[in-house]
């Protein structure tokens, strides 16, 4: 049993749940949680088992938005802006996880998506191999990326769609009673994760000044959303509409 990423599961054949990682799918953590707690959220989890990819999904781990951060050199090259706009993305080398969805999202925004192993990200930022990267704010600070990329961009291009995954063969070996215990534990973990992340994110943002981090607000978000239209076009329009509706 482990925490996986919904956006990575299409790599294993579970296409449906990966749609939750589409750019700008949810406006905030509250909407994401509402979806996760709904029948649609359960439908997304059930799709993993139906995909016969070797896993069953027991619950959601609702995390905050993934946002970008850039190095001092990239910031200076952009003219030391006090806010961030879509046109500034052009040509920036942004490290992304090696998933088709994240690569296509960054490319749609005008950046040069650059898949690099997470363990190599700090040195890649430090040496200038990439101009920036993207992640949740807590991971950004916990991994000290702020030391080499102190400019944080509030674009919230997607959310950390964590999923509690279990080996399917192991799941099938459990009794119905044991499966009930696992489902209850997953439900408790999901609730605790949401509360913890919401609190921790605010604490990290409050520490920006003392850590020397500059927050660059995105001022033309509608243009970012429009730029990603082609990313959406490749996927199930009806399911996307249900996910975005907010009526779960």
Protein language model regions, located:
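N-terminal secretory/targeting leader peptides
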Residues: 1-31, 50-51, 55-248
């Amino acid at each position: 049993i482990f925490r996986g990423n919904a956006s990575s599961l299409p790599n294993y054949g579970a296409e449906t749940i990966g749609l939750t990682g589409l750019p700008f799918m949810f406006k905030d953590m509250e909407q994401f949680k509402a979806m996760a707690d709904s029948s649609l959220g359960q439908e997304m989890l059930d799709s993993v088992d139906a995909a016969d990819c070797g896993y069953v999904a027991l619950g959601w781990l609702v995390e905050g938005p993934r946002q970008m951060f850039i190095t001092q050199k990239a910031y200076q090259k952009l003219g030391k802006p006090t806010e961030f706009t879509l046109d500034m993305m052009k040509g920036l080398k942004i490290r992304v996880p090696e998933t088709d969805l994240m690569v296509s999202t960054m490319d749609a925004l005008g950046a040069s998506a650059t898949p690099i192993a997470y363990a190599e990200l700090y040195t890649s930022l430090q040496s200038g191999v990439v101009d920036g990267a993207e992640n949740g704010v807590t991971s950004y600070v916990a991994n000290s990326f702020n030391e080499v990329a102190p400019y944080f961009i509030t674009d919230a291009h997607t959310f950390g769609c964590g999923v509690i995954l279990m080996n399917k063969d192991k799941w099938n070996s459990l009794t119905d009673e044991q499966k009930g215990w696992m489902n209850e534990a997953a439900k408790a973990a999901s609730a605790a994760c949401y509360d913890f992340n919401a609190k921790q994110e605010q604490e990290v943002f409050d520490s920006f000044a003392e850590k020397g981090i500059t927050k660059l607000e995105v001022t033309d978000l509608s243009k970012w959303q429009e730029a990603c239209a082609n990313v959406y076009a490749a996927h199930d329009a009806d399911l996307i509409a249900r996910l975005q509706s907010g009526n779960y």
